[in-house]
């Protein structure tokens, strides 16, 4: 895993202390180094760390536990299969309940500028020219790319991740998290209060999201309009744009619930609380695929790879993958291109005669701008970061739930959405479950309890409570120039 400098420093400090006799004595209560301490003593000191009044000790225990379990269950096929999880590609989507047998949508044959680069890196950067350079192929950049390409502009889309066609996606935790998520699926904040999940591949977050299409609520649109002085968000034009996107994705509320989502709907109805179907961007197909968070092998989920990037390609747009943007090229206050590196070796300059669009996500967009010398003086860059803080709630049933089967997110409870008059509430949804995340987040007191809970995975039900983020954070750069 690639973790932040703060977490590396904390873990390195603790490991260094544990490797000495004195440090081990202070932290563990036994003369070390730690690898000479018996296993029962190690389990006792980790349990004591969890209850420590010292924040650094508690953070260290969480880091050891969560990182170890996440890596173990991500890569150990035997462990994942032992607790009931089917490894690799599944064909559940072909035979959804109460529907005809389904067929995959053939993948579009993209062509990439990478094929035209020198086979061996050159000392001088390679120059690529276009009307508009778009950094990022996710939900923002792809829509802009299609819009501009359809109007006759020459567009180049730069993406730092890789492209994997639907028919070649292995749908394993290891490949999905390593290749399709930002920093291998673990981006901790500097104070370790949150761990961020973000997409990092061709199609961005739309390739690994859960296929849900929720329209912004009325109170949210009102807040955007009035707080930021942007009446567009309350206009009929914005509504038209939202519905245009929904139509292009084939959004429908005619969905098939898996058992976990059915339980959420049932529980809400029995308690008299509001719950509703979450429309899916599945091209009007019964998309019964529980592993779409590691890429959709059926091609039914209509992310940008299946929609706007295809539209852009059909109108002449070009694409450059494995290409990480270092900074924006500025000329007398105007953005004229980007400097980037392909596969960490070949330097390229992509020039945009008409302009540059940086749409690399909430973390990497400000990081690119902060790495641009001419823009560093702008103190607003990186500020006003709002996330979706999530709390996980585990429960278990007597009958199998099989949380990895079926569409991941098809129901939502809005019972707590308006606990505050201004809409600072929460939504309750169902998680796209996989052993690496499930086991890393399990609360337990010892190894026996952990093993017992891990074996109950097929019977588990994990609800997520998503909070609307009121207080803003900030994106900075770490020592390596990455988003922190």
Language-model features: locations:
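Conserved redox-cofactor binding core of oxidoreductases
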Residues: 82-116, 120, 231-326, 335
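Glycine-rich loop(s) and the adjacent beta-strand/alpha-helix scaffold that form part
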Residues: 147-172, 195, 201, 314, ...
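FAD cofactor-binding and catalytic pocket of flavoenzymes
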Residues: 378-484
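Extreme N-terminal leader/targeting segments of oxidoreductases
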Residues: 51-131, 150, 190
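N-terminal FAD cofactor-binding segment of flavoenzymes
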Residues: 153, 160-219, 257-269
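Rossmann-like flavin
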Residues: 39-41, 48-51, 55-60, 72, ...
């Amino acid at each position: 895993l690639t973790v932040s400098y703060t977490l590396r420093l904390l873990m390195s400090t603790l490991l260094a202390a544990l490797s000495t006799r004195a440090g081990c004595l202070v932290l563990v209560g036994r003369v070390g180094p730690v690898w000479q301490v018996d296993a029962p003593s190690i389990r006792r000191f980790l349990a004591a760390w969890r209850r420590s009044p010292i924040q650094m000790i508690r953070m260290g225990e969480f880091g050891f536990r969560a990182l170890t379990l996440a890596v173990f269950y991500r890569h150990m096929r035997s462990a994942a299969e032992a607790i009931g999880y089917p490894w690799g590609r599944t064909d559940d989507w072909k035979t959804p309940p109460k529907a005809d047998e389904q067929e995959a949508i053939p993948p579009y044959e993209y062509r990439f500028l990478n094929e035209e680069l020198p086979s061996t890196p050159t000392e001088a950067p390679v120059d690529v020219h276009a009307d508009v350079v778009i950094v990022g192929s996710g939900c923002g950049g792809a829509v802009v790319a299609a819009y501009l390409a359809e109007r006759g502009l020459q567009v180049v889309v730069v993406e730092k991740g890789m492209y994997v066609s639907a028919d070649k996606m292995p749908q394993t935790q290891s490949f999905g998290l390593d290749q399709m998520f930002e920093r291998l699926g673990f981006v901790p904040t500097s104070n370790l209060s949150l761990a961020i999940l973000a997409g990092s591949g061709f199609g961005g977050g739309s390739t690994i999201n859960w296929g849900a299409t929720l329209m912004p609520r009325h109170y949210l649109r009102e807040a955007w309009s009035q707080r930021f002085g942007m009446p567009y968000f309350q206009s009929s034009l914005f509504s038209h744009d939202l519905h245009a996107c929904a139509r292009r994705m084939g959004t429908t509320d005619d969905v098939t619930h898996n058992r976990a989502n059915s339980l959420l709907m049932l529980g809400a109805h029995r308690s008299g609380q509001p719950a509703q179907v979450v429309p899916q961007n599945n091209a009007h197909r019964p998309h019964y695929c529980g592993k779409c968070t590691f890429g959709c092998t059926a091609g039914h989920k209509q992310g940008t790879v299946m929609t706007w990037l295809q539209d852009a390609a059909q109108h002449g747009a070009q694409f450059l993958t494995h290409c990480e943007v270092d900074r924006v090229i500025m000329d007398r206050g105007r953005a004229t291109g980007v400097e980037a590196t392909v596969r960490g070796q070949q330097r390229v300059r992509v020039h945009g005669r008409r302009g540059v669009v940086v749409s690399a996500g909430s973390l990497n967009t400000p990081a690119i701008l902060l790495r641009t010398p001419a823009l560093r003086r702008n103190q607003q860059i990186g500020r006003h970061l709002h996330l979706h803080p999530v709390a996980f709630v585990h429960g278990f049933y007597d009958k199998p739930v099989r949380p990895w089967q079926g569409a991941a997110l098809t129901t939502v409870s809005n019972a707590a959405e308006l606990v505050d008059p201004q809409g600072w509430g929460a939504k309750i949804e169902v998680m796209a479950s996989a052993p690496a995340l499930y086991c890393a987040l399990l609360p337990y007191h010892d190894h026996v309890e952990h093993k017992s809970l891990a074996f109950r995975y097929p019977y588990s039900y994990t609800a997520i409570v998503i909070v609307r983020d009121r207080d803003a954070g900030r994106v900075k750069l770490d020592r390596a120039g990455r988003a922190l």
